[in-house]
Amino acid sequence: MSLSIDVTSLPSISSSIFKNESSSTTSTLSGKSIGRSEQYISPDAEAFNKYMLSKSPEDIGPSDSASNDPLTSFSIRSNAVKTNADAGVSMDSSTQSRPSSNVGCDQLDFSLTKGINVSANLDSCISISTDHKKEKSKKDKSRKYYPKIEADSDSEDYVLDDSDSDDGKCKNCKYKKKYFVLRMRMKQVAMQLIEDL
C-alpha cells in the first residue's frame, strides 16, 4: 500500500491588518514566542467608569458589556483588537517594514512546500493449528455405566410350590411368565443398588 500526498501546489495565504485610529498605541508581547508588535485600542478608563457608574445596575445589560463586572469588562475592552475588512494576523514576518504613515500592518504569509510520502507494506501470515479433544458432555459424565448382572436363579421352568400358591391354582397361570420377568428385573435392580452402596 502506497500513499503519496503533494501539497506544493497549494496557494499561499496572505492577508493584512490595518489600523486607522491615531489614538492607538503599540505594545510588544515579550511572553510569546512570536516576537511581533500588536496594536490594541487604548482604553479610556475614565470614560468607561463614568458610563458604567451613570447607569443603574438594573439598566446594565449584555449590550453594555461582555460582563456585568466593570473590572472584567475593562479588561476585555483593553485587549480588544480593532480590525477592518482587510483583517489578518502575522505569524511569520515580524521584521516586515511598516507603512510610513501611522498605520499598523501585520502580515500573514505562509505556504506549504513540503511533500508527504507515506509508504507501508502490509505482509502478514496467520496460521492456526489446534488439536481439540472432544470433551464429553456433562450428561455423558454424569451417566455411569454399570456392569451387567446376570441372574440365573430364576427361569421359565421354575414351578411354584404348593406353599406359594393358593391350593396350586397358579401352577399353570397365564401370568406366570410375566411374573418371573418382573421378578428378575426387580432382583437386578436390588443387586445393582447393593453394588453401588
UniProtKB/Swiss-Prot annotation:
Q: Which cofactor does it need?
A: Mg(2+)
The superkingdom of the source organism is: Viruses
Q: What GO terms in the biological process aspect are recorded for it?
A: viral genome replication
PTM sites of type Phosphoserine: 67, 153, 155, 163, 165
Magnesium as a keyword of this entry, yes or no, is: yes
Mind telling me how this protein is modified after translation? O-glycosylated.
Q: Name one GO molecular function term.
A: nucleotide binding
Q: Spell out the InterPro entries in the cross-references.
A: Rotavirus_A/C_NSP5
- Coiled-coil regions listed in the entry: none
Q: Where is this region: Disordered?
A: 17-37, 53-72
Q: Name one Pfam family in it.
A: Rota_NS26
Q: Which family does it belong to?
A: Belongs to the rotavirus NSP5 family.
What the protein does? Plays an essential role in the viral genome replication. Participates, together with NSP2, in the formation of viral factories (viroplasms), which are large inclusions in the host cytoplasm where replication intermediates are assembled and viral RNA replication takes place. Orchestrates the recruitment of viroplasmic proteins such as capsid proteins to these factories. Participates in the selective exclusion of host proteins from stress granules (SG) and P bodies (PB). Also participates in the sequestration of these remodeled organelles in viral factories.
Q: Which HAMAP family match?
A: ROTA_NSP5 (MF_04092)
- Quaternary structure, from the entry: Homodimer. Interacts with VP1. Interacts with VP2. Interacts with NSP2; this interaction leads to up-regulation of NSP5 hyperphosphorylation and formation of virus factories. Interacts with NSP6. Participates in the selective exclusion of host proteins from stress granules (SG) and P bodies (PB). Also participates in the sequestration of these remodeled organelles in viral factories.
Q: What is this protein called?
A: Non-structural protein 5
**Lineage in the entry?**
Viruses, Riboviria, Orthornavirae, Duplornaviricota, Resentoviricetes
